[in-house]
């Protein structure tokens, strides 16, 4: 199956694009899909954007079997409307996958169905590594901050994943702190809440320190392009 990956960001300060690509590539590899093209969009996808040459090349190519999005929210119109717009210029049906949402839009007639959330397997390994790093006294904030950006794209993206897997994350945190399974049931809920809140608060600190660095990098890039040059 030949597919096209579509990633998108809402602002220049959104650093999640690389994480989106990694997640989509991992999903494609898991399902034995062949990635033939990757599209980076700014803003949401609508019917107007389908008129651009980049999209026309994809839509009119019947060798493309599917489009892999990171999530449904990348599309500002209904998925059904987007599908109908694409099919006006195709003779062969096309499927759509949404990695983060674990959804696929396909079939005859096309409809949503759940898919294997293999992205969680990738995220879990990275989150386990992150927790280990945060418990190591030899790891400073710079190392941990770079690990978050390299593997998740941004602190916001990481927090979104963590908030979707609260139970699993807290169990890993408790185990990494050396807490065994003999904890009294009456104390378990309080330990879970405390551990999770402490972990999230630590991550939010990396968000504030990283924002300044990202802004500096953005300004540097804009200077190189001449955007900030005085006329």
UniProtKB/Swiss-Prot annotation:
Q: Where are the transmembrane segments?
A: none
Family of this protein: Belongs to the orthopoxvirus OPG058 family.
Expression induction: Expressed in the early phase of the viral replicative cycle.
Q: Where in the cell is it found?
A: Host nucleus, Host nucleolus
Q: Name one GO cellular component term.
A: host cell nucleolus
Q: Return the protein name.
A: Protein OPG061
Q: Which UniProt keywords apply?
A: Early protein, Host nucleus
- Pfam families for this protein: Pox_F16
Cite the InterPro entries for this sequence: Poxvirus_F16
């Amino acid at each position: 199956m030949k597919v096209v990956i579509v990633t998108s960001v809402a602002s220049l300060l959104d650093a999640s694009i690389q994480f989106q690509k990694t997640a989509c590539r991992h999903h494609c590899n898991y399902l034995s899909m062949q990635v033939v093209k990757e599209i980076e969009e700014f803003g949401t996808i609508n019917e107007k954007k389908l008129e651009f040459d980049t999209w026309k090349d994809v839509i009119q190519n019947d060798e493309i079997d599917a489009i892999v999005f990171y999530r449904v929210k990348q599309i500002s119109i209904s998925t059904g409307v987007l599908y109908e717009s694409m099919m006006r210029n195709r003779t062969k049906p096309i499927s759509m996958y949404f990695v983060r949402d674990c959804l696929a839009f396909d079939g005859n007639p096309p409809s949503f169905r759940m898919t294997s959330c293999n992205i969680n397997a990738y995220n879990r390994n990275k989150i386990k590594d992150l927790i280990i790093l945060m418990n190591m006294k030899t790891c400073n904030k710079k190392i941990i901050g770079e690990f978050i950006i390299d593997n998740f794209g941004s602190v916001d993206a990481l927090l979104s994943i963590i908030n979707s897997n609260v139970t699993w994350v807290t169990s890993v945190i408790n185990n990494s702190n050396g807490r065994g399974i003999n904890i009294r049931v009456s104390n378990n809920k309080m330990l879970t809440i405390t551990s999770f809140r402490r972990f999230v608060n630590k991550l939010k600190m990396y968000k504030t320190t990283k924002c300044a660095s990202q802004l500096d990098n953005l300004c540097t890039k804009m200077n190189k392009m001449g955007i900030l040059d005085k006329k």
